[in-house]
Amino acid sequence: MNHKQITTLWCRVIVEELIRQGAGFFCISPGSRSTPLTLAVAANPNARFRMFPDERSAGFYALGYARAAGKPAVLVCTSGTAVANYFPAVVEASADAQPMLVLSADRPFELLDAGANQTIRQQDIFGSYTRWNLELPEPGTGTPLASLLSTVGQAVKRSLGSPAGPVHLNLPFREPLEPESHDLAHPWVEPLRNWLASEQPWCRFEQPRTAPDANALTALQQILANAERPLFVAGSMDKADDAEAVASLADSLGILLFADLTSGLRLTNKCTPWQLAFQNETFATSFKPDVVIHFGGALIGKQPAMTLRKEPPFHYVVVRNHPGRFNPDHNVTLSIEASPAAVVSALSECRKPAEMGGFAALFSEVAHTIDTAACAPDEPVNEISAPRIVSSLTDGKHALFVANSMPARDMDLYAAPVSEKPLRVELNRGVSGIDGIISTAAGFSAGLDKPTTLLIGDISFLHDLNALSLLDNPTNPLIVIVLNNNGGGIFSFLPIASQTDRLDECFATPQNFSIESAARTFDLDYASPASNREFTELYADALKRNKSLVIEIRSNRQANLLLHRTLKAKLDPIFEKAGIFGN
């Protein structure tokens, strides 16, 4: 076999084994050095792939796909800065335990550190953010193909491990790079005879299941049995079964449940939306749980943690299926690595159910106040009404993706809890960046195979503008709702707003670009409703169509700040007179 044939077979073996291991979706960015990999994907009838001119966008698309599908997409790129552009998405995937596979093509050894064009040190470029990284040898008959197959299997296994995360394989290729048909009868290929005749992976990997430690469960049962004022917290959870189990236990035992937006429970009508109550000082002062059991990961809002810092509970227990430390306030007294559902099943009989009524009327008044103050039909659509309307109209046939900063906070605070079942809501909360959001949402929609709505701010929108080119899928359209307050609106809510006269110049960074022109550039439909009624009708109609759409909601940062403060002033007396936990 000549060099071209060896390289062609080498790459086709890699691609085939990836597909057999369940990693059959490829996000490819065009490049010369990655030619053998790209054409190996294109030649495989079982491979699904999409081309991305921008590697940074491709990385976030792969991240979104993994969030939805629960398995890694495979990123393929050429050498040089191409692979470096994956870095932000790799960091997010690592921080939030999302599987990802990176196959980077590289120059051969003699071109490294020799002044050769488009050549950098790519091995271990992502450092500690990968679960595994490996430099493969150059294609050659001296390397057994069986070792190549087992390496591919190991890469997929590590990506899906506990915790899941990115895996990087760096593949050097020597020119010529063009493919050439090869002979499978070659002695080098003979050990793969059975593999070639089957459709099975070279090696099957069973991911370990983490069962709750018996001693830890006994301790937790005792803690909950003796608790006088227990609180359940539902943080970010990937599996609906976990979320439903936690909600069911809280309901059956009569225990207050704080359900974060990322838990999937926040938008259900079975959970009380406590977020706004935690912003009230009277509530925060009187709320003193002695035991907190935190299921899942982090929360969007700071208020619960701030409240608990003032009156630390006697026990703070964390239950999540992740070996990493989750203890930002360093107050955790017991940490259990297991699925929340597995732990919940052991807690149902540990205490008698308690009465926890009287909240329906309170939160009905809260909802009425929000709707009157911010959501009146003929009033301008705003940054409070938009997430509330979206949450009230979206059903199980549609998914939600929410950008960080104000959209995440406002959806968490003001969403209408009307869904019968947990509604799939995703955010990039690993490191909570504002970059790559449109790309992630597009990948999430593709991985979920479901239409999706994205709620995003104007700065995040502009940050990932080229990703609008990805919204051409009629099967899974993306409705992009841009909350345009002409800059970084969140800074108006931070202490710096009152401590500098350079807020706009150094923090808010106003922009006057046309969202409409951006949408038209990418041949996307565009609308800009003025009132809540117009937005409600427009969004309800968009949910019925199989076409992507950009909806711009124009607002003003100062008006938005005033609206939030005015609404809080109207809600505070409601919580204060209720005396929920008054002693």
UniProtKB/Swiss-Prot annotation:
Its cofactor is Mg(2+); Mn(2+); thiamine diphosphate. InterPro entries: DHS-like_NAD/FAD-binding_dom, MenaQ_synth_MenD, MenD_middle, THDP-binding, Thiamin_PyroP_enz_TPP-bd_dom, TPP_enzyme_TPP-bd. It comes from the Bacteria. Its EC number is 2.2.1.9. Keywords: Magnesium, Manganese, Menaquinone biosynthesis, Metal-binding, Thiamine pyrophosphate, Transferase. One of its GO terms (biological process) is menaquinone biosynthetic process. It holds the Pfam family TPP_enzyme_C. CDD domains: TPP_PYR_MenD, TPP_SHCHC_synthase. Pathway: Quinol/quinone metabolism; 1,4-dihydroxy-2-naphthoate biosynthesis; 1,4-dihydroxy-2-naphthoate from chorismate: step 2/7; Quinol/quinone metabolism; menaquinone biosynthesis. It catalyses: isochorismate + 2-oxoglutarate + H(+) = 5-enolpyruvoyl-6-hydroxy-2-succinyl-cyclohex-3-ene-1-carboxylate + CO2. One of its GO terms (molecular function) is thiamine pyrophosphate binding. Binds 1 thiamine pyrophosphate per subunit. Homodimer. Belongs to the TPP enzyme family. MenD subfamily. NCBIfam families: menD. Catalyzes the thiamine diphosphate-dependent decarboxylation of 2-oxoglutarate and the subsequent addition of the resulting succinic semialdehyde-thiamine pyrophosphate anion to isochorismate to yield 2-succinyl-5-enolpyruvyl-6-hydroxy-3-cyclohexene-1-carboxylate (SEPHCHC). This is 2-succinyl-5-enolpyruvyl-6-hydroxy-3-cyclohexene-1-carboxylate synthase.
